[in-house]
């Protein structure tokens, strides 16, 4: 999740991962058509969880397709919207990859588990100018919306500009700032009834089949950003017709991808059918698939065992025994480029407005005990926000088991004393009477258990009170977005593309994912410099310096865990996505040998 930006995923996904994620890898300026290998490649294997007995090193991709092609899978929550310009959670991202058509997609390289490549999608090809500033996308002939209207370059142009439009309040708008003139327009305060001035914005549909995008400066990973939802096509006529209800339901969501979302029952199920008008329909094998909304991990595992769903992430050792050496399943293990974290309310009127209070909370949490007690030892402790699976133009950034939070703990051996000092500075009174309100979005048993663990851990270590409030995703995000009524929000962020900026810019004061009140001019400056810097080594240092400010000096957030995906699939599943960065959705999966 953006995630963007908000890939704020339910913590139950530590135990049961839906694997419909949508994120991306980085390309090199000299070769805009070839992405860098992700950290799921061979060189990064040392940072993944140890391979389980029976885990595959190559995904099954071949086999005679069954006559009846269908898949049953699950997700843990319903999206707030299907609007590419309005949503930001992984639940919506996963749907949009299947019902809309990005200009470019990212797929696994067959026979090279962990490697990925760009493939033409809504654009049949694209060119990059010699100066690295102008991308020309040649929009494909023959793709149509579900009402028969042709998909044109103007739909992509409109979609991007709608995300830039400040009236839209697009949560991913900062990822358009690489485009010439986009940031200025997005930050313009418009008078009532005033339209944005796009005359200097570098997004132009030259004709129905040619889209030209001009950047402020060369961006090594720009094609990765093009695969995200803010570059998906949108229908201006339907936005104007439906207004606030645009893409809030299957009926008001225009679709042009490999599948059509036929119907859904909110918080129950989603039903998809193959789009017979899709340009690449011959390579789409599934005729339908169903996504059930299941929040409880035991219910998920029972559904997998009973054949009600065809794959799931399994972390519980008791359940692993049911699947690991069972010939009816195969498994894969992958380190995810994501981080669950405590996001602190830094506003002065919150109980976490003081940086020493935040620092104390960050180092008081026993991450490994949390992992062992609540998550069966599956994920890994996080001491940096940017996960080890994310690189800088192919260069290693963070190492597993190291990080600024660990350094902070080493330099402050008494978190209670630090907490009391911060409480005194903030004028909060008696430390024992201070109540820290922790909000979470996991209403499952795992969510309650992990919340209770954190509550006990912090109360014992700091001598304060901790109140835990778990809400379902919609209520949670609505409360968090007010910036009031909470001190800590337990969130998750998953990479939308393979670059530290995708994580760190969620805390930039001008592009913040949430209204936390956090602002540090030096932090912002370092990220601004990294945005235009072309040298990978210099970018690494800029990001490290920025992350130190964020986690060590200011403790604006506190990373908790990096997740491991241990996915079990039915033996008849073929061509499933392995890479976290794949954007193929369900379009290449099929079954062979289903009994």
What are these regions (language model features)?
Residues 371-372, 408, 465-476, 502-570, ...:
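Extracytoplasmic/peripheral linker and loop segments enriched in polar/acidic and small residues
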Residues 242, 277-322:
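Ligand-site clamp/hinge motif
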Residues 157, 162-165, 169-237:
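Surface-exposed binding/hinge segments that line
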Residues 107-113, 188, 208-209, 215-284, ...:
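Gly/Pro-rich hinge or "lid" segments in bacterial periplasmic/extracellular proteins
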Residues 567-595:
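Long beta-strand-rich cores associated with HINT superfamily self-processing modules
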Residues 380-422, 442-448:
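Structural transition elements
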Residues 266, 420-495, 565:
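Ligand/substrate-recognition segments at binding pockets and active sites
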Residues 74-130, 254:
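N-terminal lobe/hinge region of extracytoplasmic solute-binding protein
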């Amino acid at each position: 999740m953006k995630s963007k930006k908000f890939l704020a995923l339910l913590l139950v996904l530590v135990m049961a991962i839906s694997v419909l994620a949508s994120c991306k890898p980085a390309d090199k300026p000299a070769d805009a058509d070839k992405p860098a290998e992700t950290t799921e490649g061979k060189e990064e294997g040392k940072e993944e969880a140890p391979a389980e007995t029976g885990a595959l090193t190559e995904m099954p991709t071949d086999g005679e397709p069954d006559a009846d092609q269908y898949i049953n899978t699950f997700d843990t929550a319903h999206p707030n919207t299907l609007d590419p310009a309005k949503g930001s959670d992984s639940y919506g991202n996963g749907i949009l990859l299947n019902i809309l058509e990005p200009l470019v997609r990212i797929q696994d390289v067959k026979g090279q588990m962990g490697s990925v490549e760009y493939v033409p999608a809504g654009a049949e090809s694209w060119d990059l100018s010699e100066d690295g500033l102008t991308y020309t996308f040649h929009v494909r002939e023959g793709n149509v919306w579900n009402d028969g209207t042709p998909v044109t370059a103007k739909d992509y142009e409109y979609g991007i500009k709608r995300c830039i439009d400040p009236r839209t309040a697009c949560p991913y708008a900062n990822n358009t700032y690489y485009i010439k003139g986009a940031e200025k327009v997005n930050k313009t305060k418009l008078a009532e009834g005033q339209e944005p001035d796009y005359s200097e914005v570098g997004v132009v549909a030259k004709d129905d089949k040619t889209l030209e995008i001009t950047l402020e400066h060369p961006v090594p990973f720009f094609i990765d950003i093009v695969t995200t939802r803010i570059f998906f096509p949108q229908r201006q006529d339907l936005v104007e017709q439906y207004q606030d209800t645009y893409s809030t339901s299957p009926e008001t969501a225009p679709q042009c991808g490999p599948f059509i979302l036929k119907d859904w029952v909110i918080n129950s199920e989603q039903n998809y059918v193959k789009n017979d008008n899709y340009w690449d329909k011959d390579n789409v094998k599934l005729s339908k698939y169903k996504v059930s909304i299941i929040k409880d991990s035991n219910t998920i595992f029972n559904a997998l065992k009973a054949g009600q769903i065809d794959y799931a992430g399994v972390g519980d050792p008791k359940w692993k025994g049911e699947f690991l050496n069972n010939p009816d399943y195969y498994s894969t293990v992958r380190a995810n480029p994501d981080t669950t974290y405590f996001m602190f309310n830094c506003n002065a009127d919150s109980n976490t407005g003081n940086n020493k209070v935040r620092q104390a909370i960050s180092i008081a949490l026993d991450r490994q005990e949390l992992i062992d007690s609540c998550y069966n030892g599956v994920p890994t402790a996080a001491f940096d926000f940017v996960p080890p699976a994310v690189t800088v133009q192919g260069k290693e950034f963070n190492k597993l088991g190291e990080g600024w939070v660990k350094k902070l703990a080493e330099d402050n051996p008494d978190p209670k004393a630090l907490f009391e000092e911060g409480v005194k500075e903030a004028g909060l009174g008696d430390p024992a009477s201070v109540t820290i309100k922790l909000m979470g979005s996991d209403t499952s048993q795992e969510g309650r258990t992990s919340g209770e663990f954190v509550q006990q851990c912090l109360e014992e270590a700091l001598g304060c009170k901790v109140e835990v409030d778990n809400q379902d995703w919609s209520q949670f995000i609505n409360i968090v977005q007010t910036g009031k009524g909470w001190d800590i929000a337990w969130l998750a962020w998953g990479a939308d593309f393979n670059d530290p900026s995708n994580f760190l810019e969620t805390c930039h004061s001008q592009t913040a994912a949430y209204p936390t009140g956090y602002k540090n001019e030096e932090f912002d400056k370092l990220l601004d410099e990294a945005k235009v810097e072309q040298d990978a080594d210099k970018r690494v240092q800029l990001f490290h310096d920025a992350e130190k400010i964020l986690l060590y000096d200011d403790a604006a957030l506190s990373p908790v865990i990096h997740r491991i995906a241990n996915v079990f699939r039915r033996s008849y599943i073929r061509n499933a996505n392995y890479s976290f960065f794949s954007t193929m959705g369900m379009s290449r999966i099929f079954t062979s040998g289903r009994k």
